[in-house]
């Protein structure tokens, strides 16, 4: 069993994709698990200080531990991607080929499969959600599946897990929060502007990257870094 897992972890598919996994992903998945565990034990949410302490602990984890986690998760994803799509997926992520649809194996109802992303996990995540977190560094909850939007060129929106075909719908509240946080830092210049926040919301929407929600960038700037495993 151990030797098989080791071989899986060093599969060419995994070796090619590993440098493109966002460093943020390890912290995000583990932080969500810690928060759920804390809530079940204490019947209350973590305070901001407690959450920050856990986040700092996870950020300081050894690179070898993060690499082991990413390798195991990529091994799971490989098995859930249809064999005929695996090579094209690697070529698209590594920038060697234009991204096309990458079909996943459906569940028993013909819908998107869900997987656990941690050992002994109490939560399963949709494959397309996992792909967006891993390769685009967008912090999404396991319940955010309805916020994912497939691109117009995606020919198989039900089963496609190509991250380049997946965007995130921006909610009005997201835009307002992005505007509010930004305006607090620019309080002086913000005086005299309308109180309804519509102009700020418009600017927040225009300044964000396509397909990403406002809070995605606000929650963790580490989402823009990749796991190069070189520090």
UniProtKB/Swiss-Prot annotation:
Principal location: nucleus
GO BP, sorted A to Z: DNA replication; positive regulation of DNA-templated transcription; regulation of transcription by RNA polymerase II
Pfam families, sorted: MH1 (PF03165), NfI_DNAbd_pre-N (PF10524)
Stretches for region Disordered: 188-231
One Gene Ontology molecular-function label: DNA-binding transcription factor activity, RNA polymerase II-specific
Start-end of Basic and acidic residues biased regions: 188-202
InterPro entries membership: CTF/NFI, CTF/NFI_DNA-bd-dom, CTF/NFI_DNA-bd_CS, CTF/NFI_DNA-bd_N, MAD_homology1_Dwarfin-type
DNA-binding region (UniProt annotation): 1-192
Keyword set includes Transcription: yes
Cellular localization per UniProt: Nucleus
This protein's UniProt keywords: Activator, DNA replication, DNA-binding, Nucleus, Transcription, Transcription regulation
Function: Recognizes and binds the palindromic sequence 5'-TTGGCNNNNNGCCAA-3' present in viral and cellular promoters and in the origin of replication of adenovirus type 2. These proteins are individually capable of activating transcription and replication.
Quaternary structure, from the entry: Binds DNA as a homodimer.
Family: Belongs to the CTF/NF-I family.
Protein name (Swiss-Prot/TrEMBL): Nuclear factor 1
Organism: Sus scrofa
Lineage: Eukaryota, Metazoa, Chordata, Craniata, Vertebrata
């Amino acid at each position: 069993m151990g030797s098989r897992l080791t071989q899986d972890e060093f599969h060419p598919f995994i070796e090619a994709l590993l440098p493109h996994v966002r460093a943020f992903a390890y912290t995000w998945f583990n932080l969500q698990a810690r928060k759920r565990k804390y809530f079940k034990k204490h019947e209350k949410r973590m305070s901001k200080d407690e959450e920050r302490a856990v986040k700092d602990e996870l950020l300081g984890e050894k690179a070898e531990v993060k690499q082991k986690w990413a390798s195991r998760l990529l091994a799971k994803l490989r098995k859930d991607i249809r064999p005929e799509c695996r090579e094209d997926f690697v070529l698209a992520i590594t920038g060697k080929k234009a991204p096309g649809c990458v079909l996943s194996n459906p569940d028993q109802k013909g819908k998107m499969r869900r997987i656990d992303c941690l050992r002994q996990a109490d939560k399963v995540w949709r494959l397309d959600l996992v792909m967006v977190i891993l390769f685009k560094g967008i912090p999404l909850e396991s319940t955010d599946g309805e916020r994912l939007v497939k691109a117009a060129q995606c020919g198989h929106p039900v089963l496609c897990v190509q991250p380049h075909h997946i965007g995130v719908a921006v909610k009005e509240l997201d835009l307002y929060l992005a505007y509010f946080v930004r305006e607090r830092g620019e309080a002086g210049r913000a005086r005299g502007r309308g109180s309804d926040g519509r102009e700020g919301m418009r600017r927040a929407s225009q300044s964000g990257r396509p397909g990403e929600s406002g809070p995605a960038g606000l929650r963790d700037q580490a989402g823009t870094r990749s796991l190069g495993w070189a520090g």
